[in-house]
Amino acid sequence: MSNAITMGIFWHLIGAASAACFYAPFKKVKKWSWETMWSVGGIVSWIILPWAISALLLPNFWAYYSSFSLSTRLPVFLFGAMWGIGNINYGLTMRYLGMSMGIGIAIGITLIVGTLMTPIINGNFDVLISTEGGRMTLLGVLVALIGVGIVTRAGQLKERKMGIKAEEFNLKKGLVLAVMCGIFSAGMSFAMNAAKPMHEAAAALGVDPLYVALPSYVVIMGGGAIINLGFCFIRLAKVKDLSLKADFSLAKSLIIHNVLLSTLGGLMWYLQFFFYAWGHARIPAQYDYISWMLHMSFYVLCGGIVGLVLKEWNNAGRRPVTVLSLGCVVIIVAANIVGIGMAN
């Protein structure tokens, strides 16, 4: 396995670790509605950071974006909005299926759809099947899916042991939302694929290869921001028990506390895709679809590890932890299989 591929896998791991940890600061926010908290973090992660970093990277910010036709920018934006819909459905999936089943089904579907649809759309899926390296990477995707399934099973065992239940369990509604979440969340993978002309243009301007994907986040995350912020603002305006004014009428020290924590959560959310861009840049072009598989499977891996570190599994008993450990090992094996396949 070449050093470039190894570093690509490593940066995807770092990005996934940030994704697995980003919600921790949000949990410490006090006396704010979820909608206010999510909006503040979202403004940081989807608007401020993408714009600020792109302004630093690009020699002429406005000239860069105006150089693309609407036919180039619109698919990138719409796929970003598609991801935004999946992001909202994610929370509803947890509500009706519970954490373990919800995450397992949603992540499993988005892993398959986001990984395999890209080469199908690009018309080179047959090349993957017909080459040894391609078949090896596809095997890695299958093994990763098995690993996600095992971790999901561990979560179910944990919830059963600890008596944790879904907020409003509804299998039919939850499964529909999980499938929708999985499909729509893959919009981020499709957006990255559609944004290749933007990446190439950034490279032509002298932007370092590790950073060429970052300017496209202004458009991608702009699409996601409109969906997420629109959802939050509509609820803040229409739901009687929610009030943006009330949330910002608290003691000044508490407002600062909440803003700082929400900002930190937003920063950590953004960092997952900052390092995703670094990892993506190191993956061979013919296997760039693998970036999504690495990110999603490592997200599940890191989520399990973070849960162990935070002692969330302490009262779950030995069997769930053993199953979780097995699932994590399978995901690591999957990453190695994919790495070997790309090296071939």
From Swiss-Prot:
The protein's induction, as recorded, is:
Induced by L-rhamnose via the RhaR-RhaS regulatory cascade. Also induced by L-mannose or L-lyxose.
Periplasmic topological domain ranges are 1-3, 59-73, 122-136, 196-213, 280-289, 344
Q: What is its main location?
A: membrane
**Keyword Transmembrane applies:** yes
Key words, A-Z: Cell inner membrane, Cell membrane, Membrane, Sugar transport, Symport, Transmembrane, Transmembrane helix, Transport
Query: Which reaction(s) does its UniProt entry say it catalyses?
Result: L-rhamnopyranose(in) + H(+)(in) = L-rhamnopyranose(out) + H(+)(out); L-mannopyranose(in) + H(+)(in) = L-mannopyranose(out) + H(+)(out); L-lyxopyranose(in) + H(+)(in) = L-lyxopyranose(out) + H(+)(out)
Q: What Gene Ontology cellular-component terms does the record carry?
A: plasma membrane
Q: Where in the cell is it found?
A: Cell inner membrane
What name has this protein been given in UniProt? L-rhamnose-proton symporter
Q: Which gene encodes it?
A: rhaT
